[in-house]
Amino acid sequence: MRTDSKTPLLDTIATPTDLRRLKESDLAQLADELRTETIDAVSVTGGHLGAGLGVVELTVALHYVFDTPHDRLIWDVGHQAYPHKILTGRRDRIRTLRRAGGLSGFTKRSESVYDPFGTAHSSTSISAGLGMAAATTLSGGNNNVIAVIGDGSMSAGMAYEAMNNAGAMHSRLIIILNDNEMSIAPPAGALSAYLARLVSGGTYRTVREAAKQLGRHLPHFIYDRARKTEEFARNFWAGGTMFEELGIYYVGPIDGHNLDHLLPVLKNVRDFKETGPILVHVVTQKGKGYAPAAAASDKYHSVNTFDVVTGVQTKPKANAPSYTRVFADALVKEAERDDKIVAITAAMPGGTGLDVFGKAFPERTFDVGIAEQHAVTFAAGLATEGYRPFCALYSTFLQRGYDQVVHDVAIQNLPVRFAIDRAGLVGADGATHAGSFDVSYLGILPNMVIMAAADEAELVHMVATAAAYDEGPIAFRYPRGEGVGIELPQIGEILDIGRGRIVREGTTVALLSLGTRLAEASKAAEQLASYGISVTVADARFAKPLDLDLVRRLAKNHEVLITIEEGSVGGFGSFVMQALAEEGLLDGTGLKFRSMVLPDTFLDHDKPEKLYAQAGLDAKGIVAKVLATLGRENEAHQSLIA
């Protein structure tokens, strides 16, 4: 063991098997060292810090008590999984988190056998764990299944659906409720820890079950009164009535940072073989053990690289405001003139910019929790009463409320405004957070209008257009990160629905862009001029309805028409192809049509600009596509390697 190391005990741990060889008295030191290593690693890579620091002791205890990976351990969302990764054979790569070719910022099945289920979106762990538990029963296995879920994730309906099913199935599933917001119970003390150890023990549960069997032979009113007395006494001290009503045996709350409390309870839960789900309620603190993160958990939930000593984060100087901030400021200006404008977010006020709107109009701002289905239908309800709701969600999270978009909004043609943030590729969070599919899945819906901002000034216009549009649902999408630095209008212009614009006139090739690929299309046009190719560049603005006049003009007046978008197959390019086919513009006209979309694969984490280059959606890729389409393959190849 190295004597000069800051983490001498952790240095001896390659896998949880090594951890389980330690004495219990060593675990507190191991937890301290694991916390130190987590802080140091995230200071280098950036990422989700506070949640991981809050579960260090819990992570150590779970891997010590349970036989992972034979016992399945699922981390809901995965923000808190960095300490888990360090203990499960990935410490040597922990400083590659969220970088190209490095570790994912979430749990990932292809990364480790210790990650039995991939996560990133919230509230999935209980459902997945219940499926694993049912499979264990069917196959006659004996492994435990443990799902760790935070109290924030418990606001999603999926978690309650899973718990309701778990209680009815009587499958053996262990749920760890990580309460790090004090939203369910106050801090746990010695008495509650003692009671948790008592009621989780085999003796108590065996006697309780025997009493139930005996009670069934007593007169009903006596049995019922005894049952209620026992439940009242236990829940008075420990809480958990709601879980018991769902058929889940509740234990807790206990201090999630006290190993002397955690270990005996987890051992009792592990060793008692009665079927049925168990929930262990642990109370933790986000950012535990690192003063800057503990003092400002919201600011240290997700961080840039930072100085470990001071906690000061490294933030590159912005060259332009972010699209998110431009949206927020534009919405505030619209709301100053229209008191019917309201805003809805699903537990992401800061991420969507609605914290800015909330400061200006707190009574008109609704944070509904991690509940996208509810958010969409809640917005629909507001729309029925004459309000103008803006439902601001990340593209990837809007997927979670898709049936509500179809059934509650589109079919009823209600004027809900969808502000779709993080459209396109997002970078370090990878495939789970990419906004690749919204144009495809919204564009097939009757009544839906879809816009995509080419730059931040266009976004201001689209906010104004959405605010003024009362004929039905309307969506506008925009990416993560900074704008291009264009001057912003003071007041947004209301755009003509379904009308695009020409930004550069040419004669041979037409590039029809949707969204922020417009800048790359314009660069490509400049480069293609050196090849003697005259290029028209157009901004579609609308994916639906299409500007058919513009499409006809581009198709009839050019040899080549190429659509470019930051989305998957089945989106804007497919809509244009359908229109061309219906108009007969592909019938022996000689037009060469191509569609540039994201590849039919899930792209891993990297910087967005590198991912777009990988997908061929940068200026170099567009130049190569044009040259190849014109039959100049050698030049196309040379342009890519230049």
Curated annotation (Swiss-Prot):
First-tier enzyme category under EC: transferase
Enzyme nomenclature, EC number: 2.2.1.7
UniProt record, GO biological process: 1-deoxy-D-xylulose 5-phosphate biosynthetic process; glyceraldehyde-3-phosphate metabolic process; terpenoid biosynthetic process; thiamine biosynthetic process
Gene Ontology MF terms: 1-deoxy-D-xylulose-5-phosphate synthase activity; magnesium ion binding; thiamine pyrophosphate binding
Keyword Magnesium part of the UniProt annotation: yes
Family assignment from sequence similarity: Belongs to the transketolase family. DXPS subfamily.
Protein known as: 1-deoxy-D-xylulose-5-phosphate synthase
Name of the coding gene: dxs
